[in-house]
């Protein structure tokens, strides 16, 4: 707390193996250093860097669009686009049953779990299904039939959703930005299957000429997930588990920033 300025920084790790508390502590210290002073945020359309902690906001929309049940209901914008380019060519999304913290040998219908590539280099390969959805689609089950609770029938659900990382570190990605915002923590829900969203930036920073110059406050980011990820600038190499989603940091364009200056 600094006067009437409240700063909240949170971080953590989800791992199947050993944790690295030093890594988490160093990230928190870095964010504290970046937040030493408040700066005026940019307005209009600027590149947005979502850290690995915040990037699952984007991937939740893709997860919904890949759901075979949404395809059957005609809600997915990708319903009739198998084999087509649906996003940036650098994006590959898969499910790995043995890789993450939510690993399982089979789903709630007894179907063995398997490695699946849903999007490869931007091309839509497959939707995930349970037995009922797979039969109706004519594709068969992918082993993704899970019960939300004991009183419910199985429904398609993803687990260990993996976004293939890129090559740049967070520092290298920051260096390539001329004027941008880093979004590290957000307030508000996800985008949903439509892809449209407007979120408050709980913790964000401004980048000028490759350097983080300070913390931005009273700022919102709005736009569409599908549009933004088609205009992907870079994927980082710093993949982290955020729940059941493994994602690196992401730099996108095509989003608008709105701010209030006190």
Q: What role is predicted for each listed range?
A:
Residues 1-62, 66, 126:
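Internal alpha/beta scaffold segment
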Residues 10, 55, 67, 74, ...:
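Glycine-rich, flexible loop/turn motifs
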Residues 25, 81-262:
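Dual-mode signal for accessory low-complexity, basic/Gly-rich regions
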Residues 48, 61, 78, 90-92:
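Aspartyl protease catalytic domain
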Residues 50-51, 70, 189-191:
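Alpha-helical protein-protein interaction elements
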Residues 65-86:
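Amphipathic alpha-helical
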């Amino acid at each position: 707390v600094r006067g009437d300025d409240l700063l909240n920084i949170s971080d953590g790790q989800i791992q199947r193996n050993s944790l690295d508390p030093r890594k988490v502590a160093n990230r928190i210290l870095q964010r504290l250093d970046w937040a030493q002073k408040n700066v005026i945020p940019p307005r209009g359309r600027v590149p947005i860097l979502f850290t690995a902690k915040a990037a699952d906001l984007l991937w939740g929309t893709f997860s919904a669009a890949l759901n075979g049940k949404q395809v059957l209901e005609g809600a997915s914008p990708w319903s009739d686009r198998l084999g087509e380019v649906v996003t940036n060519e650098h994006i590959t999304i898969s499910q790995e049953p043995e890789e993450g913290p939510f690993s399982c040998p089979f789903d709630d219908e007894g179907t063995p779990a398997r490695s699946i590539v849903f999007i490869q280099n931007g091309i839509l390969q497959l939707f995930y299904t349970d037995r009922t959805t797979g039969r109706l689609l004519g594709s068969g089950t992918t082993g993704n039939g899970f019960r939300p609770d004991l009183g419910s029938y199985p429904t398609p659900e993803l687990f260990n959703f993996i976004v293939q990382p890129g090559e740049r570190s967070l520092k290298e990605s920051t260096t390539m930005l001329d004027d941008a915002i880093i979004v590290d923590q957000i307030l508000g829900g996800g985008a949903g299957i439509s892809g449209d969203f407007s979120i408050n930036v709980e913790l964000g920073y401004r980048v000028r000429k490759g350097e983080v110059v300070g913390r931005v406050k009273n700022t919102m980011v709005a736009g569409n997930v599908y549009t933004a990820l088609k205009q992907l600038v870079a994927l980082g190499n710093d993949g982290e588990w955020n729940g059941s989603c493994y994602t690196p940091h992401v730099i996108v364009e095509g989003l608008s920033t709105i701010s209030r200056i006190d």
